[in-house]
Amino acid sequence: MRFWSRIALVMALFATAATGAAAETPVERGRYLVTTIGACGNCHTPRDAAGKPIAGRELSGGFEFEDPGLGHIVGTNITPDVETGIGQWSEAEIVTALRDGKRPDGTLIRPPMPIPVYKQLSDNDAAAIAAYLKSVKPVRNKLGEAHYKVPLPPSYGAPITHVPEPPRDDKVAYGGYLAGPAGHCLLCHTPPGGGKPFDMSLAYLGGRELPDFDHPGGIAVSRNITGGSKHGVGEWTDAQIKRAITQGVREDGTRLARTMPFEWYKRMAPADLDAIIAFLRTLKPPGTE
């Protein structure tokens, strides 16, 4: 009897392992990145009059907002609709668009698409995002016209050829990957400076003016999220930081603007939240103590 109990236990363990492996196919990994930490729908999903994402039209573009530094922005359709989306793009072309900021016709993608950090998406994660985007329901959505205040950058640098997998067994390093390339927290929470759109000497120190998604035409200013500084979130508990990320509520109970994509972040894996917080705790900017 004990022998068969052990056999049953082994079979259960194998079944659990198989289930876990199945959830990490490229499409499943891509779904996770797009719909949680990547929060692609925060810009690429249209919203109703109350500012809520419209169900059934996910990633079809059409969300319009005023960016104080860039101009009138219109989120593009990234569903595989052939006429109005990216249905004619190959998965390799989607990866090039993500990491090199270049469309199949050779034109450059404008900000606020976070190309500067997407350049460091791992090969597997970039491919997973592309695979997922090709798998979603095509939605036809003819978009309005964007109007920019600033010219296109001349380029986003040399083409990306290879980015290795991030070290998931290193909690802090993986948290840095999630906060940077995967979740692009880095871009919203890093101010411009020195004639550059992002002053990396002030990374995560906040102060960047962003569109306020709760008040059209309004401005939201990103906060300092360095976790090793009393001027950032260093005096917040882990639970308070998690609540801000996943519910949009500060430590004092006030609400964050929906520019912060907590509606997507709330579906993030607990281990990924822990990794991001562990990374933020290591940030101790000079001159902030």
Question: Where is each model-derived feature located?
Answer:
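Electron-transfer interface patches adjacent to heme c in soluble/periplasmic c-type cytochromes
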Residues: 59-93, 116-126, 203-244, 262-273
